[in-house]
Each structure stands twice: as structure tokens, then as C-alpha cells.
């Protein structure tokens, strides 16, 4: 499914940071879908065991390869969305307030300063998503 990112999402990330921003985007997209339509489910939120629907087939996401790929994709979409903001604020390089906002935005869409920080942030996102797409909770609700 194509993930959409709005300027409001980018603003949310700027105010709340990378992890909360990515969580917000995923959760908004998933909440729009019925549990049976979601492309991802978590069968064990403690061990973070995810199943991903790929080419109409459910597959165990062994090393979180697909989920990590999706997190990076959302981050990249946010970076691209910054260009929309830049076009709407062409004076951002000259206006100190806008320049500051731009740098805060950039900080909020980058996963981390090093691979250790990136992995730590990805794990936080996966834990939250595990709770959101927990198939056991969904089955209890029906």
C-alpha cells in the first residue's frame, strides 16, 4: 500500500521527533484499514514477530526486513515532502525563524546520527507497531 505523508505529518514529526512522527504516519494509515485489510500483523508483540502481506501472500518477516524497509521508506517520503515546504517558503534560507524550522524538520526526519541510534529508533517504532497491529487483540475484539 502506498503510504502518504502530508505537510501536517511533517509538522507533527518536527514537533514530536522522528520516532513519534513515523509512528503517527503508520498508525494513521493502518487505522483507516479494517484489520483484515492491513498488510501487516504482529503475532507476538513481546518477541516482535510480524507477518507481512507481500504479493497477496502472508510471509513471516524473519529479520524485520520488510518492516525496516517500510520505516526507511516513510522517512524518505518525509525528506521529499520537505521540498514542498521549501517551495512554499522560498525565503527559508534568509529568514532565521524559517531556517530554524527547516533544520528542526531535517532533524525530525533523519533516523539517527549513527547506525546504533538508527537501530534503537527502529526498535521503538516496531514495539509500538507491534501493539497497534497485534492480531491477538484484533481477534479478541471480534
Language-model segments: what does each one mean?
Residues 1-142:
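Extended amphipathic coiled-coil helices
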